[in-house]
């Protein structure tokens, strides 16, 4: 399928694809169904076997922030010092904002280094340069478990609200297609998190919910255009209407995805180690969400027996009922009823 990409400026408006051309997206749906099938069940297999690597926010542990004044943080030397300590030898040491500042994370119990883990770390770092302990955060296992439960609940509640919203704004078949698409996106993103061993923390949860929002936005734009074209299009077959609708929204979809990806790529390359996990999840999620909106959510309407002719008939019947009510109201106001 050739799109013939060409950017043209018309006044202040940018148009990437030929507005009058209809691309056969649905002709490629089985290819993308196969790709999605492999990624979806591959992600489930990863989650069942490898699982997720919960960070301090969800598993409990300690975070210590250290800033060096006279030089960049000697991370390799710090790792050598920590290698002699049973608790800190597996600690995560990453830059935080600049090369002079680092965070030290470990998931052992809060009392594993005694009552003051900051003092223990400061003692072990003596001789590595002039530094200060700027922050010590401790999350207990119980609090971590509660945060994990609330995080799962946040995703579930968001999916339920999406189902209700689309069901009210469109109809139940659109709602189910959107929910399946969103679940598809979440599972694949979580599979990528497991595959890449990204720590699951509050930042990760924020990235997942943001991905849900972007994917839903794309899906609603396409569904809204499908609903509009079902009423007005010359086509009577569902897949032809979907091709027309997606083609009409293609420039907007591509521009939104590309501009968002550019911002996220900037975070990935210049945001530092602390935000790498968030940016990777966003990159994967935007790509998967864009694909699922076009090739998963839209074709699913046919699975739920959505019919263009039946929908048009229901719209006509609804308009007739509306006109009849308006006629009766007018007659009542005139006193003729």
Which residue stretches match the model-derived regions?
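A structural signal for conserved, well-ordered secondary-structure elements
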Residues: 2-337
């Amino acid at each position: 399928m050739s799109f013939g990409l060409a950017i043209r400026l018309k006044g202040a408006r940018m148009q990437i694809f030929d507005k009058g051309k209809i691309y056969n997206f649905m002709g490629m749906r089985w290819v993308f169904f196969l790709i999605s099938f492999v990624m979806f069940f591959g992600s489930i297999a990863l989650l069942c076997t490898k699982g997720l690597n919960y960070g301090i926010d969800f598993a409990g542990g300690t975070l210590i922030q250290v800033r060096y004044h006279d030089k960049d943080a000697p991370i390799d030397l710090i790792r050598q010092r920590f290698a002699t300590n049973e608790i800190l030898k597996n600690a995560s040491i990453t830059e935080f904002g600049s090369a002079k500042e680092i965070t030290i994370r470990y998931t052992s119990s809060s009392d594993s280094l005694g009552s003051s883990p900051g003092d223990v770390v400061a003692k072990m770092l003596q001789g590595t340069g002039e530094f200060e302990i700027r922050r010590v955060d401790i999350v207990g296992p119980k609090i971590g478990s509660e945060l994990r439960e609330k995080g799962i609940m946040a995703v579930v509640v968001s999916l339920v609200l999406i189902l209700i919203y689309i069901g009210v704004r469109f109809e139940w078949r659109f709602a189910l297609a959107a929910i399946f698409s969103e679940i598809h996106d979440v599972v694949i993103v979580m599979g990528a998190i497991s595959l890449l061993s990204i720590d699951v923390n509050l930042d990760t949860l924020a990235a997942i919910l943001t991905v849900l929002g972007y994917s839903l936005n794309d899906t609603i734009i396409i569904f809204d255009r499908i609903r509009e074209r079902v009423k007005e299009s010359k086509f009577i077959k569902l897949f032809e209407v979907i091709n027309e609708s997606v083609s009409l929204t293609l420039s907007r979809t591509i521009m939104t995805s590309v501009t968002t990806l550019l911002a996220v790529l900037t975070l990935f390359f210049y945001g530092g180690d602390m935000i790498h996990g968030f940016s990777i999840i966003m990159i994967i999620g935007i790509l998967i969400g864009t694909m699922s909106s076009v090739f998963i959510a839209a074709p699913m309407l046919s699975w739920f027996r959505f019919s263009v002719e039946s929908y048009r008939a229901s719209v006509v019947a609804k308009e007739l009922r509306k006109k009849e009510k308006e006629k009766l109201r007018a007659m009542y106001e005139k006193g003729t009823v």
